[in-house]
Regions:
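Bacterial Sec-dependent N-terminal signal peptides
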Residues: 1-22, 422
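Subset of outer-membrane beta-barrel
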Residues: 18-422
Length: 422
């Protein structure tokens, strides 16, 4: 029987989760793909390709590390709080979620050469719901299908950026990618003579991730310049294995079938291009485009032929983002003059196919502030805070509206400064 995507009720256990998501859409593929931007560019819709800040970390384009300020050590940590409204027909439900998201650091090693390291989320899985249906029209026997899952993937990276010639920078990240997921589907019947069937999907992922990037800055005049940026992420098979365990229980018997596939999951080749316009130190505007070739990736799935590795669950993913910021005067004595005001938006097509239909598209809008942290020993650190609205929607499926508060703190320390003793 074709699996119904409709839910009757999300369980109370979803009310406050730590997995980074509580979306039923995360039961497919690698789950919901994470927003990998950090605090400052997340408030600008996630634009990153042309951004090269001396006091913020932009790991999405490693070429930007070459612009890290000398004598500076940057440390950035972020978290998010969100509430999601799920709507299907006349049924509505709110669910809360919080998540520690990323930690990164960056510093200059030599003139025109910087490095960065950190841990960044790639995908998240977290859901728990059930459906109830009649076995057939007019039947008194009904069955309940319970769906629940958890997991996700992360990458721990180290990268370097170098400016070999004036205005041109290159960089690379290499990282250890790891994660796991557990997805369970259990059918139970009101007729005690009917079999209870449980399917338990699991996977362990251990692999690598590799990205390269470049940036070139055109000096238009003394007040304006434009930076073009581009990155490429290598697509490849992931190490580890995926397993399906099917257990059928009746009053008198229990049968178990286990199927395992090695290297059954892959990640896509990804290409990003973008530009950023800088006007003095007051205005930054940027726009990015990203293509992820998920249609070439494989994933284990239960089909009419059994549990097999297929490429039918995915399609190419496209994302467009734009945003910017304004700061009146970064050197002013007045605090409000040094506050960064940011805004941005993005549109993303789905990488998933659900029962042969396109998964949910996402539209998102964000506003935020960069608040300087000033005290007697440090006036360079910054609190990056933003409010984000996002909608995931697909025809005939659940609509999700999410309101998210993103919080990031960038600590900016002058670790390598030589102090004079009088």
């Amino acid at each position: 029987m074709k699996k119904t995507f409709l839910f009757l009720m999300l369980l109370p256990t979803m009310a406050f989760a730590q997995s980074g998501t509580n979306s039923p859409y995360s039961q497919y593929g690698l789950g919901l793909l994470s927003d990998q931007s950090t605090g400052f560019n997340r408030a600008m819709g996630g634009v990153a390709q042309g951004m090269h800040e001396s006091n913020q970390i932009n790991h999405q384009n490693p070429a930007s590390y070459s612009n890290v300020d000398s004598l500076t050590f940057l440390f950035d940590v972020g978290a998010a709080l969100q509430i999601t409204n799920f709507k299907e027909g006349n049924r509505k439900l709110n669910a809360n979620n919080s998540n520690f998201e990323y930690v990164t650091m960056s510093f200059r090693v030599a003139p025109r050469f910087g490095m960065s390291a950190g841990i960044i989320p790639i995908s998240n899985i977290g859901y728990d719901y059930y459906t109830t249906n009649k076995v057939s029209e007019g039947s008194t026997t009904s069955y309940t299908t319970q769906y629940n899952g958890s997991g996700g993937t992360r990458v721990m990276y180290i990268g370097a950026g170098w400016q070999p010639i004036k205005n041109f920078s290159i960089g690379a990240n290499i990282g250890y990618l790891w994660g796991s997921y557990n997805r369970n589907v259990v059918n139970s019947y009101t007729d005690e003579n009917a079999n209870t069937i449980g399917r338990y999907y699991s996977a362990e992922i251990n692999s690598y991730k590799f990205d390269v990037g470049a940036q070139y800055t055109f000096k238009l005049n003394s007040k304006n310049n434009i930076t073009l940026g581009a990155t490429y992420s290598l697509g490849h098979d992931l190490g580890g294995s995926a397993t399906l365990q099917e257990i059928s229980n009746s009053l008198n018997t229990s049968d178990t079938i286990t199927v395992t596939h090695d290297k059954a999951i892959s990640i896509p080749h990804s290409y990003s291009v973008g530009l950023a316009w800088y006007h003095t130190k007051k205005i930054r505007l940027g726009a990015d485009y990203t293509l992820q070739q998920w249609s070439t990736c494989k994933f284990p799935d239960l089909t009419s032929k059994g549990y097999e590795v297929t490429k039918s669950a995915y399609q190419d993913r496209h994302k467009v983002a734009f945003g910017g910021e304004f700061v009146n005067n970064v050197n002013s004595r007045r605090y409000l003059d040094r506050v960064h005001v940011r805004a941005g938006a993005s549109y993303t097509t789905p990488y998933l196919k659900i029962n042969g239909q396109d998964g949910p598209k996402e539209i998102s809008a964000t506003i935020g502030l960069g608040l300087p942290i000033s005290n007697s020993w440090n006036n360079r650190s910054m609190l990056n805070i933003s409010a984000q609205w996002a909608q995931n929607n697909a025809k005939g499926m659940i609509r999700e509206n999410t309101f998210r508060i993103n919080i990031g703190i960038t600590f900016n320390e002058r670790w390598f400064q030589k102090w004079k003793v009088e």
